[in-house]
Amino acid sequence: AGKTFTYTVAEKNDGQPGYTYDDAVRTVTIAIADDTAGTLTATTTVSGGPEGTHETVHKSGENKVEKALVPFHNSYSATTNTPGGTAAQVVATKTLTGRPMADGEFWFGIAYQGELVAYENLKPNIGGHVSFDTLHYDTKMLANLEAAGLAYRTDKDGKLAWTINYTAYEDLFGLPNGVSATTWSFGFKVIVVDNGDGTLTATVDYGGIEPLFENVYGAEAVDAALTGTKKLQAAVGLTPADITGKFTFTVTADEAGAPMPERTTATNDAAGNV
């Protein structure tokens, strides 16, 4: 009785990548008092952290004991934009039938599946290809996408993972004279895996299709590919089931004699392409 015991509590910084450590040293004092009537009182004071000072009091004979908490605060974040991280790179083939194609005369964008606004600035065709900006992610962005219904969790092998569906498309406004688009969009997904060391690995999945944009020049009859995208919205925290072949779509003509495809019904693939 009448004694005070003082302790310091500090967190060891192991330097694990992706983690932040709490470097504030907490001081814990325990003061013992005797009221000379047979009751001891222990007053515990915790100080030194950003939460301020917290005091708990316990008297002998009391059944309820309030624990003296010594809180430490840590956080974890990961990104593709760091050594060891991998961003997603989307590259498509661009063809023009009927005349030579000049670099920069066609423009292309990427949008979240079901969205109308381009995710990034439009990119031109160069050398028969379209190279989009790399798609970078971090854990905060993924959390926001999940909350907005644009990403869903697909954890695998004990690692956190997210899947984001996109549509790559050709900007059809301002096409050169005499040019029409036959294959102007395709769907794809990006799977982002948290490696647990502050890095994210983003991988593009084209769902087994060739990433391709096709245009035709000329007034003669041409074949046109009719494509679509199916988006399945799942509630936050739920992983949508595999939708391969689960939805059927039918093409009908509003006018008699209108050109029709050989197959007038089709189903979607795993990435939502129709």
Regions found by a protein language model. Give the residues of each.
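Solvent-exposed loop/turn and edge beta-strand elements of beta-rich ligand-binding domains
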Residues: 1-274
